[in-house]
Amino acid sequence: MIADPHCHTLASDGMVTPAELVSAAVTARVNLIAVTDHDTMASVREAQQLGEAAGLTVVAGQEITTGWPAQTHVVGWFLDRPVRSGMSVEDTVAAIRDQGGLAIIPHPFIPVYFGSIQPAMLRRLLDVTTVDGIETMFTAPLGSWRRRQLDDFYVAHEERLGARIGGSDCHFGARDLGCVVTRYEGDFRGAVTRRTTVPLKTRERRVPAGVALRQQWRSLVDLPVRRLRGEL
């Protein structure tokens, strides 16, 4: 079975509707996706309804922005309701688990100031709690040195980091959905809990420069403005 458990729609900074996302997943022949928009679950219900009709499992999720100054991201899966943004990383993990969800660290160690947890912060988090999984394979550029650093970090902290996860961080529908996936056997949640998941890269992401620039505007300008307005 194949999952792409990190996908976005127009509800946050993705470039596709829920219908387009589901269609892309069916075309890519994945068995499961998770809708993980930034700080909102507005597209989840529609995607789940469309997925059910298409024979696709859609997990209710969210990519939550933690508080300043870190503003890193934590993904929650199997959520019943949105998780409030702006909390500490450890409180965000706790809020996900309080409603029975799984807490996942997305795209770690990318050398940017926000959005990607850094080694020292992740080490501090693991001093006080565990997580259910961490993306060890993703589409964002990491570089060979940081890739080795991530691999070594996972080996050293596997018991507290949970399952190895692969996800495309899909923002462009058919252009990137399924580029990086998670292979699993049986029930997805059970496979994550048992740590039997296997991250895989299936192809390169191919997104025209103009489309990528429009998405970056949505991410870096439109999304923060919506947060300031209280829309997220």
Give short role names for the model-derived ranges.
Residues 3-5, 9, 15-23, 42-48, ...:
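Charged catalytic cores and adjacent phosphate/nucleic-acid-binding surfaces used
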Residues 10, 22-42, 59, 101-104:
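Divalent metal-dependent hydrolysis catalytic cores, especially in the metallo-beta-lactamase
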Residues 38, 63, 108:
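Short, ordered loop/turn segments at secondary-structure junctions
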Residues 86-91:
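Ordered, amphipathic secondary-structure segments that act as subunit-interaction surfaces
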